[in-house]
Amino acid sequence: MNVMSKLIISNDLLISILLICFSSFFFAVHDSLLKYISLGNIKWYHNIVIGGPFGFIILILMMIFSGGVKKNIILKSYKIPILRGMLSIANPLMAFMALKYISLSIFTTLILTLPFFLVILSYYILNEKIKKTIIYSLIIGFIGVIIILKPEIESFNFYILLPILMSAISGINMIIVNKYNSLASPYGFAFYNLLIPFLLGVMLFINEPFFPDFKTIIFIISSWIFGTLGLLFLTYAYHRSNFYTNRIAPYIYTQLIWAIIFGFIFYKDLIDIYSVIGSILIVVCGINILILKKG
């Protein structure tokens, strides 16, 4: 490999890392705004109906610059994209409920268990082999989850299970994309991923219409813009990274740094020693899995 090739790879790697870090920041802003919204009197379907169109606008703009809208949403088969969309209904509902009752940092930490579920699901669905070191990381990582959960019957917060379920569902969705990637483009999958929950939200909204105050509406729109930008930056980062995704993937954990900062500044969230220990185990094992899985 000549010097010029090394410089190009180094430049692409740096840009991809920056894109991942920006996407993590955008996702953290989205979650912080969603927590504020969830503390009000509106339901998850009010949020998705008011903010969803802005997500669609950004997604459609992305399609226009990626082969056109028709090319991305007109498919030979709609079964798999619609199945993913149906699975995705649970995520906005659970995120809305969870953020109302648990801290931003704990929510983010448990969402970042996604690599654990990807490994497990890849083994059973894609028949991928798992290295022993990854198995050890999974065990230690889930011990970290148990430490955070603190499963004492008297004080157990059942809402803390929701982000874990979200990670499992997201893992299934990502495995489906991996297995059936020829059926649709990433933007096509994302479109139907948003469309199905949005249509359900519209039906529920018609039955119980509600428009919050202007400030909350601005927060809702902003959360959707930041969430969609996070998805855009993340998608583009992986598109650029090609053969070194294992070197950029660990940077998704920078989202936890922002979650801790935003949680403390805006919601006075403080984490106890158990949450700190559990979070460290999850992050270290998650990074280890992301590196080893592609290695």
Model regions: which residues?
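Hydrophobic/small/kink-forming positions within alpha-helical transmembrane segments
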Residues: S24, A28, I60, G85, ...
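Helix-helix packing/entry segments at the starts of transmembrane helices
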Residues: F107-T113, N181-L195, L232-F264
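Transmembrane alpha-helices of multi-pass small-molecule transport proteins
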Residues: I42-A90, I169-I172, F191-E208, I225, ...
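Membrane-interface helix-cap regions at the ends of transmembrane helices
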Residues: S5-I9, G55-K76, I143-S155, P197-I218, ...
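Loop-to-transmembrane-helix transition segments
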Residues: I15-S23, V69-M94, F158-M166, F211-G230
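Hydrophobic transmembrane alpha-helices of multi-pass small-molecule transport proteins
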Residues: T133-K150, Y274-K293
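C-terminal transmembrane-helix exit sites in multi-pass transporters
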Residues: A95-M97, P115-Y136, Q255-V276
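Glycine-/small-residue-enriched transmembrane alpha-helix faces in small-molecule transporters
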Residues: N2-H46, E154-K179
